[in-house]
């Protein structure tokens, strides 16, 4: 059977008619808010059959621009507004209701209302275009473990100091829809639900730490640590040295600290650790005894049985501390004798533990004489006999006082305080004012090659921070050791005034020499123990000591 291209069999035509009928039944009635225009399925049928004179054109939906004086009342029909209002009311009531089963009841009523309203608008019995909404989730529940750790907050009416969070009371707000049926998005940025929520704080049953202070609760956005790291450093220190210094952690607390201008931080920490509180009254340092103890200023007199106030006269702290250093600890005498060459052992003499004279005190290397504590002279013949290429000859302390500074009495009493001007024995601050302190030394090196470089590496804090100073050539050593082919180098340590009045100096010597073909280097570290010296700068000057 042959069929022409223009003709179609009847069975194909019947199938096309059935498909067209099904399409017409499935097409919904489209409503527009334009006056005088209504688009429905009949318009599509007429356009397809060609029986209508007017065809659907997008230009017919356009309007000329005009000034609108008042809102068009027929833009949103009353039935449509009422329908969306009822829909929002039903959603809100269902979100607050604990039983989710009521959702099916009001959805049927809302569907019936929508059906009647659409019929009144369209004038037909065809089912309207239905907006399918997702089922509402039940009210969120909090796990029991979380409830035990963070109890539920009280209502604001019962507690005046109540602080609550809106997100805790309403974890999931019900959705709100626009009049057009779209979901309304909140303009407020809510917190991520993956982060832990901050519980409500109650003043009566607050969480407290072991020391009794209220514990800091984690906030929502910004988090601060409860310990603040603090480092103390000099004004001219390098960042590398500051990074190696010790770090002090100041724990944050809610207790108010008293304002004490005359109390040192070290003394304050000692008093607080012993249970005493420091106060400052008329620039006099006094201590207040804790509860349960008698006041130290009021002592009962056994003779008359009356309490008297023992008010002591104010004395200089510098005088009291220096007097304490001379009287409290008697000089320790030792019967041990130091043998030349045995520099590996610690030296114990009458001034090893109680230095009250300004000077240098060796700890682990031999010296010829200790009559002048400001100058340490070593036995160079011992080092020369051991065929050492570099060794220390002499170490001296130089102190220069500015007479113009001390002539002015006002400047003497107004001595500036440094950040570490107080030593462990409680010496008053300001000993560095008006003084220049230097440590100078001499080094003997073997003349191997012409190019020489001698460096002294030293530290004040047990090698936590190190410093280096390069030595300067002075002359040959024929005047001291003739025929030994030695050279003399000189070095100066000029940061003595920046350390504590009783510092511990430790240093070693590095010697390198070279020519065009080879290079040699040697170390003098006192047989692997380094040179250790105690530097005392806050004691009395011995007038009988020999001039440096």
From Swiss-Prot:
List-wise, which residues carry Phosphothreonine? 52
Q: Kindly list the GO CC terms recorded for this protein.
A: protein phosphatase type 1 complex
The answer to whether UniProt assigns keyword Kinase to this entry is no
Show the GO MF annotations. glycogen binding; protein phosphatase 1 binding; protein phosphatase regulator activity
Q: Which residues form the CBM21 domain?
A: 419-534
Keywords tagged on the record? Phosphoprotein
> What InterPro entries is this protein classified in?
CBM21_dom (IPR005036), CBM21_dom_sf (IPR038175), Gip2/Pig2 (IPR016717), PP1_regulatory_subunit_3 (IPR050782)
Which region ranges are annotated with the description Disordered?
1-54, 118-143, 191-212, 293-346
Q: Highest taxon of the source? A: Eukaryota
Keyword RNA-binding included in the entry's annotation: no
Residues bearing Phosphoserine are 51, 155, 221, 238
Tell me the GO BP annotations in alphabetical order: glycogen metabolic process; regulation of glycogen biosynthetic process
Q: Where is the composition biased (Basic and acidic residues)?
A: 1-23
Extra information? Present with 125 molecules/cell in log phase SD medium.
Q: How does it assemble?
A: Interacts with phosphatase 1 (GLC7).
- Protein name from the UniProt record: GLC7-interacting protein 2
- Print the organism lineage: Eukaryota, Fungi, Dikarya, Ascomycota, Saccharomycotina
């Amino acid at each position: 059977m042959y069929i022409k291209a223009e003709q179609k069999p009847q069975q194909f035509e019947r199938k096309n008619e059935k498909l067209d009928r099904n399409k017409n039944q499935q097409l919904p009635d489209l409503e527009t808010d334009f006056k005088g225009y209504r688009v429905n399925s009949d318009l599509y049928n007429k356009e397809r059959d060609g029986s209508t004179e007017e065809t659907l054109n997008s230009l017919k939906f356009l309007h000329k621009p005009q000034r609108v004086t008042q809102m068009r009342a027929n833009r949103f029909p009353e039935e449509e507004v009422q329908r969306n209002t009822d829909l929002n009311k039903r959603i809100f009531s269902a979100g607050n209701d604990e039983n989710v089963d009521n959702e099916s009841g009001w959805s049927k009523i809302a569907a019936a209302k929508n059906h009647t309203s659409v019929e009144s608008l369209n004038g037909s019995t065809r089912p309207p275009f239905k907006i399918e909404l997702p089922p509402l989730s039940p009210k969120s529940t909090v796990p029991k473990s979380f409830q035990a750790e963070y109890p539920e907050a009280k209502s604001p009416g019962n507690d005046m100091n109540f602080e609550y969070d809106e997100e805790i009371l309403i974890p999931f707000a019900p959705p709100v829809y626009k009049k057009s049926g779209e979901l309304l998005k909140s303009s407020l940025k809510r917190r991520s639900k993956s982060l832990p929520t901050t519980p409500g704080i109650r003043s009566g049953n607050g969480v407290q730490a072991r020391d009794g202070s209220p514990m800091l609760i984690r906030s929502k956005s910004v988090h601060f640590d409860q310990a603040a790291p603090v480092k103390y450093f000099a004004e001219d220190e390098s960042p590398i040295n500051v990074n190696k210094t010790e770090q002090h952690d100041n724990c944050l607390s809610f207790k108010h600290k008293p304002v004490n201008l005359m109390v040192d931080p070290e003394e304050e920490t000692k008093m607080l650790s012993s249970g005493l509180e420091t106060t400052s009254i008329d620039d006099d340092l006094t201590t207040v005894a804790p509860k349960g103890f008698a006041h130290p200023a009021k002592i009962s007199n056994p003779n008359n049985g009356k309490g008297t106030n023992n008010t002591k006269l104010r004395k200089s702290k510098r005088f009291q501390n220096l007097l304490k250093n001379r009287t409290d600890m008697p000089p320790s005498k030792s019967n041990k004798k130091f043998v030349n060459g045995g520099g590996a052992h610690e030296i114990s003499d009458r001034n090893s533990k109680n230095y009250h004279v300004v000077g240098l005190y060796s700890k682990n290397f031999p010296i010829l004489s200790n009559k002048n504590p400001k100058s340490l002279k070593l036995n160079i013949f011992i080092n020369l006999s051991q065929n050492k290429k570099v060794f220390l000859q002499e170490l001296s302390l130089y102190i220069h006082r500015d007479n113009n500074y001390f002539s002015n009495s006002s400047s003497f009493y107004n001595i500036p305080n440094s950040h570490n001007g107080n030593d462990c024995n409680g010496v008053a601050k300001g000993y560095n004012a008006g003084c220049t302190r230097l440590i100078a030394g001499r080094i003997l090196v073997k003349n191997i090659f012409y190019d020489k470089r001698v460096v002294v590496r030293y530290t004040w804090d047990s090698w936590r921070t190190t410093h280096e100073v390069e030595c300067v050539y002075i002359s040959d050593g024929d005047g001291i050791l003739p025929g030994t082919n030695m050279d003399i180098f000189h070095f100066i340590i000029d940061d003595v005034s920046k350390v504590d009045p009783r510092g511990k100096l430790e240093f070693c010597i590095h010697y390198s020499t070279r020519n065009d073909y080879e290079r040699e280097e040697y170390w003098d570290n006192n047989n692997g123990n380094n040179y250790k010296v105690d530097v005392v700068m806050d004691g009395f000057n011995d007038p009988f000591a020999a001039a440096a």
